[in-house]
């Protein structure tokens, strides 16, 4: 995930944007940090999904085919 100081800076810029507004440089920094955050979030979510197996009440593996293929590609 994103470093704590970067998350703090995102929040700081968001507060400033609501109150006083951002300079062009700050707006650019905010956009860059948000892109980094979204990229880190997506990677974490993808990594988590690659560990998921779906089991129905009968005990059968019903993991979607697309996910199984993605897991296979990732781990082999």
Swiss-Prot record:
Residues 57-76 are annotated as: Disordered. It comes from the Bacteria. InterPro entries: DUF896. The keyword Cytoplasm applies. Keywords: Cytoplasm. One of its GO terms (cellular component) is cytoplasm. It is found in: Cytoplasm. The lineage of its organism: Bacteria, Bacillati, Bacillota, Bacilli, Bacillales. Belongs to the UPF0291 family. This is UPF0291 protein GK1331. Residues 63-76 have a biased composition (Basic and acidic residues).
